[in-house]
Amino acid sequence: MAIIDKKRVNQNFSRGAKTYDNYAQVQKHMADKLEIFVHGSKKQYNILEVGCGTGIFSQKILKRFPNSKIDLLDISPAMVETAKEKLGDSPNLNFIVEDVENYNPEKKYDLIFSNATFQWIDDQMRLFNHLYSLLDYGGKIAFSTFGNKTYFELRESLSTLDPELKYSQKFVKLDEMTEITNKNFRILAADEDFFIEKFENVMAFLKAIKGIGSNSALSNKRNFTREKFKALDKIYRDKFGDKNIINVTNHLLYMVLEKVKMRDENLK
């Protein structure tokens, strides 16, 4: 079974740090939608953002929580440096280069935010168990991630080209995410939407993915020849486009969770 290679994730996002904002239309849409679920406050909170990237959602956190202490965490040093340049110096900001699964601070957080990051973590149950341990009681998590219909056109086209060929990582269904998070949290909100992108061809689509550092981070990624790309483009275009464009579906999930004292209680 293919698993996500964290070292490759780091390398890919570091290479894409400078071009990320030019291609990150989906991530910007997700940030705008996620912000709808966030109620700001002038109170001082301890806040963690997981996967701050170039600071797209970080800017929204700063605006909504101007008096809070905010830790911005990302696995990629280059992403963190880009976020620093964008956000500027602030005594309320602390930048951390770390994999969230290895992050074990002494303090607890009141709020955890994450935009378009959790899809890069294989074991979602383990992730949310860990996030539970980082939150104070009554603390909340608000996040966006990618759902199971993301890039379904690419997966179907690849399967038609070669049934053994796998390219993009597995994305979860909303009901699967609900089942995972309901074990430890009270679910305050759960929603999904779709963002359709259009590209001239498959190469342009994959170039855009590479531009944000999101090119496949699977450890069993196989190389494509020019002939395979040409064949893939024809299959994709015939099924999910026309002579001018191809359609790319992004299935987006949003959730808000609250940590409760009885983590094993069957909450309603």
Swiss-Prot record:
GO molecular-function terms, A-Z: carboxyl-O-methyltransferase activity; malonyl-CoA methyltransferase activity
Keywords for the protein's UniProt record, in alphabetical order: Biotin biosynthesis, Methyltransferase, S-adenosyl-L-methionine, Transferase
Class of the enzyme per the UniProt entry, highest EC level: transferase
EC number: 2.1.1.197
Catalytic activity: malonyl-[ACP] + S-adenosyl-L-methionine = malonyl-[ACP] methyl ester + S-adenosyl-L-homocysteine
Pathway the protein contributes to: Cofactor biosynthesis; biotin biosynthesis
GO BP terms: biotin biosynthetic process; methylation
Gene3D superfamilies membership: Vaccinia Virus protein VP39
Recorded family membership: Belongs to the methyltransferase superfamily.
PANTHER family: TRANS-ACONITATE 2-METHYLTRANSFERASE, TRANS-ACONITATE 2-METHYLTRANSFERASE-RELATED
Known function: Converts the free carboxyl group of a malonyl-thioester to its methyl ester by transfer of a methyl group from S-adenosyl-L-methionine (SAM). It allows to synthesize pimeloyl-ACP via the fatty acid synthetic pathway.
Protein name: Malonyl-[acyl-carrier protein] O-methyltransferase 1
Biological source species: Ilyobacter polytropus (strain ATCC 51220 / DSM 2926 / LMG 16218 / CuHBu1)
